[in-house]
């Protein structure tokens, strides 16, 4: 079972919140106190909440659910992509385009355009174009890949989103809320836990903390997928007998 320990969280600096003057009073239940003008997250609250969230991610993956990892701030961007790829899930790590979930129909058309351009770049179509046309299409493809590359194979809305930084990704959270998609989020002391189904109180800026959250989440998803695949194989064997 994918879990994190208190020691791992301390080593990663999960307990370091923001300066006290930037705090959100709604995070009071999760704050241990302050040190040198910085709020300290109560890891005794975070630990069970995080492990509960991991268990739920495993359950969703076990039911063949799709998880969308969201983290567009610089400190999270590359790690978000790596974690999603590692557990064969989906990600948005550059910029959240308004309507990415709530206007999925339009997003799907943009994904189709991206895939068409990818095909054209590989089947020789680009070579038949003028230099300018080929360059324009290459630029369009690169732009679409940056925005939609992590969700181009998602084929429909996700079953949950895992967010690094509730405050920073509030638009993504609002869209998920509107559609009834469960939200898992790292919530720092300057953010609001409102509208987050699985609150994980902790530092959302430190690279080591972000890496810890994502590694654990990816492990939980892989565990669920492995169990689901084992069940599928068992059914296939029984059907073949």
UniProtKB/Swiss-Prot annotation:
The keyword Ribosomal protein applies. It holds the Pfam family Ribosomal_S2. GO terms for biological process: translation. GO terms for cellular component: cytosolic small ribosomal subunit. GO terms for molecular function: structural constituent of ribosome. This is Small ribosomal subunit protein uS2. Belongs to the universal ribosomal protein uS2 family. CDD domains: RPS2 (cd01425). It comes from the Bacteria. The gene is rpsB.
């Amino acid at each position: 079972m994918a879990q994190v320990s208190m020691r791992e969280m301390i080593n990663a600096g999960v307990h370091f919140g923001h300066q006290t003057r930037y705090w959100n009073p709604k995070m009071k239940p999760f704050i241990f106190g302050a040190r040198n003008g910085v709020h300290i997250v109560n890891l005794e609250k975070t630990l069970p909440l995080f492990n509960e969230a991991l268990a739920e991610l495993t359950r969703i993956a076990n039911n063949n659910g799709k998880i969308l990892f969201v983290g567009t701030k610089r400190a999270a961007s590359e790690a978000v992509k790596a974690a999603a790829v590692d557990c064969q899930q989906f990600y948005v790590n550059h910029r959240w385009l308004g309507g990415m979930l709530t206007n999925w129909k339009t997003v799907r058309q943009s994904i189709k355009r991206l895939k068409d351009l990818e095909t054209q770049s590989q089947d020789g179509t680009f070579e038949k174009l003028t230099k300018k046309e080929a360059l324009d299409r290459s630029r369009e493809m690169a732009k679409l890949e940056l925005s939609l590359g992590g969700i181009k194979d998602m084929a429909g809305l996700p079953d949950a989103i895992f967010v690094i930084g509730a405050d920073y990704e509030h638009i993504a959270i609002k869209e998920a809320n509107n559609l009834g998609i469960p939200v898992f989020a790292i919530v720092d002391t300057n953010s609001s836990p409102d509208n987050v189904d699985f609150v994980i109180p902790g530092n959302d800026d430190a690279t080591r903390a972000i890496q810890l959250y994502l590694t654990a989440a990816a492990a939980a998803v892989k565990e669920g997928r492995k169990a689901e695949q084992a069940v599928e194989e068992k059914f296939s064997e029984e059907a073949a007998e």
